[in-house]
Amino acid sequence: MLDIKFVRENPDVVRQNIRNKFQDAKLPLVDEVIALDLRNREIKKEVETLRANHKKASKQYGALRAQGKLEEAEKLRAEDAASEERMTALSAEEKQVEADLKQKMMIIPNIIDPSVPIGKDDSENVEVERFGEPVVPDFEVPYHTDIMESFNGIDLDSARKVAGNGFYYLMGDIARLHSAVISYARDFMINRGFTYCVPPFMIRSDVVTGVMSFAEMDAMMYKIEGEDLYLIGTSEHSMIGKFIDTVNKEENLPYTLTSYSPCFRKEKGAHGLEERGVYRIHQFEKQEMIVICKPEDSMMWYDKLWKNTVDLFRSMDIPVRTLECCSCDLADLKVKSVDVEAWSPRQKKYFEVGSCSNLGDAQARRLGIRVVGPDKTKYLAHTLNNTVVAPPRMLIAFLENNLQADGSVRIPEVLRPYMGGMEKMVPKK
């Protein structure tokens, strides 16, 4: 959410930003917001004047009564009563105007960074850099669920009976590998100075609207019936929410946290669910990282965060590349975002395994995450988030890139302590 003062003083900048995101239907919102803001300020000014007059009238009324000027006193009292009725009406209008203003402000997208490429969809995202040499083996790489099934490691049919499409049972060595990757990612981030945290897996609606746009909320979040609670789509939601309505000392920044959680997503929208496979599903587990920092440090942390993911994947011998997300591919709260994609030997192309985002002060403004400096000046923090690792997408990349010609899967050295020293997984069938 933008600062209303910024919108008031820079309406053309806001309009051009909307055009750059190809959201022209939102252009009328700018004039609507400016009109509501003007009316809101007019109301406040009139209420302030009426309150001052009321205070003055109260003193005059007492003085007139003391002087025996009862007729004048009653006339003044009647006038003041009319002013009080006006204040009551204005207060009700003010409440409605502020609610309408906030609702419209939350729909206007954040101002994207000037470095973001302008594009209409994710096909116009721009490759930034490749890490590791993509390998195409001289044998056929099976579909990822076929690899898992060769280890008796996945049961989609039973999961479908129990919960419907978009769920799975992982078993045996595949389940063990899943846990090993999560544990390794946790320790990887701890060793890089991040504080480990296991957050709440449900959050209230005020936190939901604080961390994401209405469009994201509708497409992703599961609501608990009869409760003001939602299942988290990523632990970023509850981790950023941890700082709601806080004033943080500048000397304590940055806060760097890495968190584990299950994640729940409706996956409503253009992509939908895969009928076969575990690439896009309703439930998965993820290791996340978030940063709360000073505004001038957020771009530095942005680069550090996505590099952590690249380093993690490269430590497991998985080639990756980074893609700069274009303007239309950015969610409305994001200032800048990069996708990390892993190499798929089977498809002979890269696919998304994580995303790093700088949200500027958008989440901080919605949630009231403030910082107080040495001179007692208060300002909004900047927030960032990044995927450390998200099985089962990570498992797809891992299995394909470490698969051997005999059907076994090599375990990279960094994962062996988490797999009981196992050097390779041998198929059961």
Which residues make up each language-model segment?
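TRNA-recognition modules of translation machinery and tRNA-sensing kinases, especially anticodon-binding
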Residues: 27, 130-429
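N-terminal alpha-helical targeting/anchoring segments
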Residues: 1-134, 149, 153
